[in-house]
Curated annotation (Swiss-Prot):
UniProt family annotation: Belongs to the class-II aminoacyl-tRNA synthetase family. Phe-tRNA synthetase alpha subunit type 1 subfamily.
Name of the featured protein: Phenylalanine--tRNA ligase alpha subunit
Gene that specifies this protein: pheS
Pfam families (alphabetical): Phe_tRNA-synt_N (PF02912), tRNA-synt_2d (PF01409)
Top-level division of the source organism's lineage: Bacteria
């Protein structure tokens, strides 16, 4: 039996010296140390030994088991180290290769235009004012010299929540709130979302953005308004941009005007974008109506002011030559990543 045990040790050593994988190593372990392994089979025959031989053979068997277990563990560690090295060689990193570029977010074209408008007017000393989008009828209409029978109050144009509360149709209510709570001089712009019951098409949306401006002080004139709008147009659309004013009517300003800029695409010679007119309407403006000043507790005999308002979507469409407003809201990455 001693010869059998020594033979098992020699045979196991030979096989362990040539093992190449973890799977082969496991097969060797089972072959010699498993429940039906060769070493286990020899130990089962110890019952036939004499009492004197059993301790000697038992000690030898335990030494051989311990030796085989130790060699298996050594071989396992070597194989793991070898496999790790081979994996690193296969997956070598070329540090000279360019890295994977991450997708970075960009500003939405509407945000770009709003920020540009803010920068222009902040540079002229204006402050930013904001107000609620869910507004009282008084601030949205009455305080702006729009009586209850005025067409602008038609339910077809306005989203009413109840008879006294609505979604603001313009950012003008912010101007009223500022004039109520601040004494002149006042110099503000009011950017924000507004709501009107319009069908969605290439140039209309029930939700859109406006930026309105207000200046109230002693001695403010129409000339100040024209100069301000000229600086704004040149800053936003380029130094060669010209403006023109056409008489118009707004309930909250008097006199009032629609303001056009020379076409940014053709420079005023006429093209498809400006419908061959050379001019594109961008905003409405005028001198603040005396009744509006009075409602806010400002004496129109002492103070005067001007106001203006423009649609951000249409300005962005002109700024970036976009021909359909709906593109601004469809969240198509192929479109938005151009800006």
């Amino acid at each position: 039996m001693k010869e059998q045990l020594n033979s098992i040790r020699v045979q196991a050593e030979q096989e362990l010296s040539n093992v190449g994988t973890i799977a082969e190593l496991e097969n060797i372990r089972v072959k010699y140390l498993g429940k039906k392994g060769e070493l286990t089979a020899v130990l089962r025959g110890m019952g036939s030994l004499s009492p004197e031989e059993r301790p000697v053979i038992g000690q030898l068997a335990n030494e051989i088991r311990a030796y085989i277990e130790s060699r298996i563990e050594e071989a396992r560690n070597e194989l793991i180290k070898k496999e790790r090295s081979q994996k690193l060689e296969r997956e070598v990193i070329d540090v000279t290769m360019p890295g994977k570029r991450k997708m970075l977010g960009k500003k939405h074209p509407l945000s770009i235009v709003i920020d540009e408008i803010k920068d222009v007017f902040i540079g002229m000393g204006y402050e930013i004012a904001e107000g609620p989008e869910v507004e009282l009828d008084y601030y949205n209409f009455e305080a702006l010299n729009i009586p209850r029978n005025h067409p602008a109050r038609d339910v077809q144009d306005t989203f009413y929540i109840n008879n006294n509360i609505l979604l603001r149709t313009q950012t003008s209510p912010v101007q009223i709130r500022v004039m109520e709570n601040k004494k002149p001089p006042i110099k503000i712009i009011c950017p924000g979302r507004v709501y009107r019951s319009d069908a969605v098409d290439a140039t209309h949306s029930p939700i859109f953005h406006q930026v309105e401006g207000l200046v109230v002080d002693k001695g403010v004139t129409m000339g100040d308004l024209v100069g301000t709008l000229r600086v704004f147009a040149k800053s936003l659309f380029g130094e060669k941009t010209e403006i023109r004013l056409r008489p118009h009517h707004f309930p909250f300003t008097e006199p009032s005007a629609e303001v056009d800029v020379s076409c940014w695409a053709c420079g005023g010679t006429g093209c498809r974008i400006c419908k061959n007119e050379g001019w594109i309407e961008i905003l409405g403006a005028g001198m603040v109506h005396p009744k509006v000043l009075e409602v806010c507790g400002i004496d129109p005999e002492v103070y005067s002011g001007f106001a203006f308002g423009l649609g951000v979507e249409r300005t962005a469409m002109g700024r970036f030559n976009i021909d359909d407003m709906r593109l601004l809201y469809e969240n198509d990455i192929r479109f938005l990543k151009q800006f």
